[in-house]
Amino acid sequence: VLSNAAETRATPTTPDNLKNTDFDVFAFTGDGTAFMGKVDTEFGHDGVNIVYNNGKWDYKNASDLRYWPTGALDFYAFNPGTVSEDMMMNYMWEASGTVQKISYTCIDEYGANTGHANYDVMYAMAKGQTKDMNNGIVKFNFKHILSQVVFKAKTQYDNMQVDINMIKIHNVKMGGFFTLPATADGTGSWSDPADLPSEVSGLGKFTVVKDVNITVKSNTIATDISTTTPMLNRPQELTAWKVSETATKSKLEADNAKQCYLEIACKIRQSGAYLLGSASEYKTIYVPFGDTWEQGKRHIYTLIFGGGYDDQGEAVLNPIQFDAETTGWVNAAKDVNV
């Protein structure tokens, strides 16, 4: 299903707003014959569209209505089912009786100035369903395939003040293929799209915030940076910039080694005196950043500002530390101080 409607910011889907979404459904018989949708072995936007209307989930198009056969069916659903024109190549899916995959490439939505948003992509499956189960109603439990990432900040000392203008994360995988699990209680798996162009399959950068003036002046209470504007990212393991090693001392060497770091434009003051930047100028520091982003988890990072590194790997004040947590969108299992 395609739409020209432009999104403005990623909106994580919760049980409270699920009814504002739609999804596309496929159903296959035991021998792999398509009963709803079609045997789809190429990425696209096929399937039977289901929407929430008049208090219930229903077929968007009456012509798609299907009645229960005598045998069991395996159902697969992809949410959202409506794809805006600008995201058609970023988000696609395919489904057959044996393999179901999602192709998704994230966009730098907070840095691109396009007004478009990443999708909180989800899937659901219900295998071996018959007309006698659940009064003939197929029950879907949608699961997120992406990770959610947000930031807060504190200062290292109570007499410090930090003014943040921009934060970016460098050397992050932008997308890949997600293969649905064999059973509904599985987790699925991500793989790299090696056959796609480097700008799609390679590493990129994500903007956390830009062109802002966020003041941080407490070493006990964290100041919010992006908890209401979360980034949605592909789950992955991030290897932090190894600034202490000779082979990866500089930022350029870290880029070549595919090591991850934060780029932060800020001003740092202590007792009113500028340690970094000035009243009229932000300065850029770089901070090694590593963690494992998990599927369906919300990762919360608290930056503890005391300094960082320049692009040659030389210390600027004291390096920033982290405190990290994750729960299930759910936040991921721990808070991470950075």
Give, region by region, the residue ranges found by the protein language model:
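Intrinsically disordered, low-complexity repeat and linker tracts
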Residues: 1-2, 293, 297-338
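Intrinsic-disorder/low-complexity recognition with aromatic hotspots
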Residues: 19, 187-189
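Short beta-strand elements
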Residues: 95-124, 277-309
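Short, low-hydrophobicity acidic/polar segments
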Residues: 1-174, 195, 199-237, 263-272, ...
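Short aromatic-acidic-glycine turn motif
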Residues: 172-183
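A generic structural signal for short, solvent-exposed coil/turn residues
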Residues: 17, 132, 143, 279, ...
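Extended, compositionally biased non-globular segments
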Residues: 215-294
